[in-house]
Every structure is written in structure tokens, then in C-alpha cells.
């Protein structure tokens, strides 16, 4: 859907082994664009994507799109014979209640993606995958149960990533930063910059810096005014001296198709 919205023609899909690999391929110039999940309404932020973005602040977000997520249990044998369930860790977590009720003794095995899980279970009478109905058609699998996600309104926000110049105009801007010091009021001082400029923070998420226990990187989404303004540039200028590192992934349009 993101590809269609941005009118990307003659798209060639490149197989990758995980979300970090997807971002790395883009950063290394092996592809022109990448689509990654960033946040789920049930399980929260997708940590692999967040960590990969922090490693590649040169990338920019071109568009965001929220889509409804409905998982199916797919396999080649009957549900009664399933002893192993494969899927991406996020999908397994989003279906944990259903699995506990219907397959309490099945071993849950994480994979790099739901599509990879579907490929791995094809032909096995005792393995099943949590994936989309589309994956069933692509890999010749039967639909053993649908839907299997615990929350009916399950939604995921996806990002279209590109290399190149960042936009300063859009519905939302995404930033990530680390602070000079872990001290009382340091984070409050940084976030106060948004309030002082009348900007709404629609999301904040923290990830370990991976350097020291208790040291964090903060990911922030900021709602931007509809009318053109210097609000984003002014915010970044005010934040810069407060941060050890500040990554600006650009401003971009954001759409929600989960209600369609």
C-alpha cells in the first residue's frame, strides 16, 4: 500500500533476513526504499526497527501508514496435530492468548518474519505458522484458524524509508536523541522545548543506549501544524545543545487505513 501511494514504479522486491537487514540494505545503497513496521497497537514499538534507525540517522522517513492486522494460523496438517508454532516474535505476542487457549502445549518458535514462518512450515504436518491469508496462497498452506490475534482492533504503523534529503513539512516529524547526562530534569528540559513551541508529542519511546545500564535513547514523534512554519527547525535548534546526539528523520504525511 505504501508503494502504491508513493507511485513507485517497476518495484523489485529484495529478500532480507530480518528488519535490521532491511534497514542495512537501504543504508548501504542496495535498494532505493524500504518498508518497516515501527509500532503496534498491542505490543508497542518494534525494537529492531528503532535500534536500526538509531544506527542510521542518515535515513529519512517519507511516509507513514497505519494498517489493520489480522493473523491466521496456517499449516499443512490438521490443527489437532500441531506441536510447533512459528512466527515473528511480535506476531507470537499478539496471538499469545489464543495460543494459550487453543494450543497450550505447542512450542513457539520465533522467525525473522511471518512470511519466513509460512515458508518454513510448508509440507509439515505438525508445524503451523502465524501469518497473513496471503501467505497461505503463496506457500500452498491451509487456513487452520482465523483470526487468531487477541485484540480485534490490532493495528500496525509502517514507515517508508528512503535515503536523501529530509522534508521539513508534513503531518508528523520523527526525532531520536540521547542526553548529555543522566540527571534529574534532563529529559524534562528536552521535552519542555515542545511545549514551549505549542507542539504535541504524539509518541515517546525509550531504548537502551547499549553503552551503560540506565542510559537511554529517546524516540519522539511530533505533530506539526498544518500551515507552513519554522516550528520544526526552531525545535531542532533548541534541542541540539541539550542532546549528546540528535537524529532527525524528517517530516512526512501519515495516513490511517485501519478503519477502511
Which stretches of residues belong to each language-model region?
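Domain-level signature for soluble enzymes in the chorismate/prephenate branch of the shikimate pathway
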Residues: 1-260
Amino acid at each position: 500500500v505504501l508503494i502504491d501511494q508513493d507511485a513507485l514504479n517497476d518495484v523489485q522486491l529484495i529478500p532480507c533476513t530480518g528488519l535490521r537487514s532491511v534497514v542495512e540494505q537501504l543504508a548501504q545503497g542496495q535498494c532505493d526504499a524500504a518498508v518497516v513496521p515501527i509500532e503496534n497497537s498491542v505490543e508497542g514499538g518494534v525494537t529492531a526497527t528503532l535500534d536500526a534507525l538509531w544506527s542510521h540517522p542518515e535515513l529519512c522517513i517519507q511516509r507513514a501508514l497505519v494498517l489493520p492486522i489480522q493473523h491466521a494460523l496456517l499449516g499443512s496438517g490438521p490443527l489437532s496435530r500441531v506441536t510447533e508454532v512459528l512466527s515473528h516474535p511480535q506476531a507470537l505476542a499478539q496471538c499469545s492468548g489464543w495460543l494459550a487457549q487453543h494450543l497450550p502445549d505447542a512450542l513457539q518458535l520465533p522467525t525473522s518474519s511471518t512470511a519466513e514462518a509460512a515458508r518454513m512450515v510448508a509440507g509439515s504436518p505438525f508445524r503451523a505458522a502465524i501469518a497473513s491469508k496471503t501467505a497461505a496462497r503463496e506457500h500452498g498452506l491451509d487456513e487452520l484458524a482465523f483470526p487468531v490475534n487477541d485484540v480485534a482492533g490490532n493495528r500496525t504503523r509502517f514507515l517508508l524509508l528512503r535515503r536523501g534529503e529530509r522534508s521539513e513539512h508534513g503531518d508528523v516529524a520523527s526525532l531520536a536523541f540521547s542526553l548529555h547526562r543522566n540527571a534529574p530534569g534532563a529529559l524534562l528540559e528536552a521535552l519542555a522545548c515542545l511545549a514551549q513551541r505549542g507542539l504535541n508529542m504524539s509518541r515517546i519511546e525509550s531504548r537502551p543506549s547499549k553503552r551503560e545500564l540506565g542510559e537511554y535513547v529517546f524516540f519522539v514523534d511530533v505533530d506539526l501544524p498544518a500551515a507552513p512554519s519554522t516550528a520544526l527547525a526552531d525545535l531542532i535548534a533548541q534541542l541540539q545543545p541539550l542532546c549528546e546526539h540528535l537524529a532527525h528523520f524528517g517530516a512526512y504525511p501519515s495516513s490511517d487505513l485501519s478503519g477502511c
